[in-house]
């Protein structure tokens, strides 16, 4: 037996990720060669800088989960070489063994490193910061043969501690109240978010469909937002909701919407990228859409609702009331849309002969059905929408969103 020590128990905001064995992946599509040995060394240094990444979860007698470190060395990166359409071997995630994994896939000479991390340790912002650090260290090693001394970081704090340290307390409203107006009111079709009766023992990849807009079309989307004084997040939210409304073919039923809000820059003092695991709040909106609804007006109402909830402190303390469920749907409520906009992703630092041309996200859950998650980002100037779903019509939903976005592009192209 190797000696182990408990770091801390998972907070309530983190427990749901342990219950569903949820790992998130961020893949980089690389042009140019990649040195596997240097990447391995960079990963080792990342683990040294963030010791909690070398830990695992253990379930306590009361059913709660604890982050535990031991003296076992992390197995390091996994290198997989493939040719043509050869399928990659399945990834095996076990949160009681490891919380982070780095796979370097080399297909016909093209490299794709993917960093996977347990969602209880990091949200997307936190994860991207780790990827930035990994690539920066890799670049130093490849170009100079050395790197700066390792700065060891403490284990990230849960959201609850971050809020308490900043005087954010539970208020009367949770934000869910506005969705109650649609609960047990409508004759609803079968839910796409219905959970499976039997779940896999280990996490499985949630299938994904996606679309990517060109740089030119992405610029027009941004120009449309500027011209109409809209946030990109609000416009993309409106596009997703209008697409969902069209696909559902239930025109008289509103579309409930929940989305995460990064609190790092909304709290005082601000929260650094890796200071907390998942420092987010949850925003809500009930989309009342009808034939002729204008996407800009819908986006403006989403934005106004968001600003009001932020001003009243509702979003900041929402997690003190509830934790959003990724699996299943509240009874009596139309299927909830979940959408995360990651904004404009900055370029990663790389050696001169290497470029990260694109990226994509992956979700792993130990569930067989019920996951419905939209995400978006702008990387290398191109807007990408991803739809992670167990449902049968992923491509249809993505095509409906792309249709909404191309209508915005056409609208902006006709200006002037």
Swiss-Prot record:
Pfam (any one): PapA_C
Enzyme Commission designation: 2.3.1.282
Domain of life of the source: Bacteria
Catalytic activity: 2 a mycocerosyl-[mycocerosic acid synthase] + a phthiocerol = a dimycocerosyl phthiocerol + 2 holo-[mycocerosic acid synthase]; 2 a mycocerosyl-[mycocerosic acid synthase] + a phthiodiolone = a dimycocerosyl phthiodiolone + 2 holo-[mycocerosic acid synthase]; 2 a mycocerosyl-[mycocerosic acid synthase] + a phenolphthiocerol = a dimycocerosyl phenolphthiocerol + 2 holo-[mycocerosic acid synthase]
Enzyme class: transferase
Site (Structural role in the organization of the active site): 123
GO MF, any single term: acyltransferase activity
UniProt keyword annotation of Lipid metabolism present: yes
Active site: 119
UniProt cross-references to Gene3D superfamilies, sorted A to Z: Chloramphenicol acetyltransferase-like domain, Nonribosomal peptide synthetase, condensation domain
GO biological process: lipid metabolic process
Subunit annotation: Monomer. Interacts directly with the acyl carrier protein (ACP) domain of the mycocerosic acid synthase (mas) protein.
Domain statement: Consists of two structural domains that are related to each other.
Family (UniProt): Belongs to the acyltransferase PapA5 family.
Task performed by this protein: Catalyzes diesterification of phthiocerol, phthiodiolone, and phenolphthiocerol with mycocerosic acids, the final step in the phthiocerol, phthiodiolone and phenolphthiocerol dimycocerosate esters (PDIM) synthesis. Can directly transfer the mycocerosate bound to the mycocerosic acid synthase (mas) onto the substrate alcohols.
Stated name of the protein: Phthiocerol/phthiodiolone dimycocerosyl transferase
UniProt gene name: papA5
């Amino acid at each position: 037996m190797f000696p182990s020590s408990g770091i801390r128990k998972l907070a309530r905001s983190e427990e749901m990720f342990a219950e569903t064995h949820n790992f998130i992946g961020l893949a980089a599509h690389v042009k140019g060669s990649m040195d596997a040995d240097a990447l391995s060394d960079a990963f080792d240094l990342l683990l040294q800088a963030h010791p909690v990444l070398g830990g695992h979860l253990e379930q306590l007698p009361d059913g709660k989960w604890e982050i535990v470190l031991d003296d076992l060395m992390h197995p390091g990166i996994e290198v997989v070489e493939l040719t043509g359409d050869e399928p990659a071997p399945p990834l095996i995630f076990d949160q009681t063994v490891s919380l982070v994994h780095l796979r370097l896939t080399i297909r016909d000479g093209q490299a794709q490193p993917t960093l996977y991390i347990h969602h209880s340790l990091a949200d997307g912002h936190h994860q991207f910061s780790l990827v930035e650090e990994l690539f920066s260290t890799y670049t130093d090693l490849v170009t100079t043969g050395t790197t700066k001394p390792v700065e060891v970081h403490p284990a990230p704090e849960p959201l609850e501690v971050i809020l308490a340290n900043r005087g954010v307390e539970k208020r009367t409203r949770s934000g869910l109240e506005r969705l109650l107006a649609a609960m047990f009111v409508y004759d609803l079709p079968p839910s796409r978010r219905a959970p499976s009766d039997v779940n896999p023992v280990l996490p499985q990849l949630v299938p994904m469909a996606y679309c990517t807009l060109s740089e030119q079309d992405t610029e027009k989307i941004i120009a449309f937002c500027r011209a109409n004084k809209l946030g990109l997040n609000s416009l993309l939210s409106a596009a997703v909701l209008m697409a969902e409304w069209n696909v559902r073919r239930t025109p008289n039923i509103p579309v409930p919407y929940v989305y995460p809000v990064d609190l790092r820059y909304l709290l005082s003092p601000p929260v650094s990228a890796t200071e907390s695991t998942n420092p987010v709040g949850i925003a809500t909106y009930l989309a009342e859409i009808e034939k002729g609804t204008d996407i800009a007006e819908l986006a403006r109402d989403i934005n106004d609702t968001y600003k009001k909830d932020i001003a009243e402190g509702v979003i900041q303390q929402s997690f003190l009331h509830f934790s959003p469920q990724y699996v299943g749907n509240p009874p009596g409520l139309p299927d909830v849309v979940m959408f995360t906009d990651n904004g404009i992703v900055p370029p990663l630092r790389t050696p001169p002969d290497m470029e990260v041309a694109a990226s994509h996200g992956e979700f792993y859950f130990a569930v067989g059905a019920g996951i419905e998650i939209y995400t978006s980002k702008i990387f290398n100037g191109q807007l990408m929408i991803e739809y992670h779903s167990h449902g049968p019509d992923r491509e249809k939903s993505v095509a409906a969103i792309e249709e909404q976005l191309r209508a915005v592009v056409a609208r902006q192209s006709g200006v002037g």
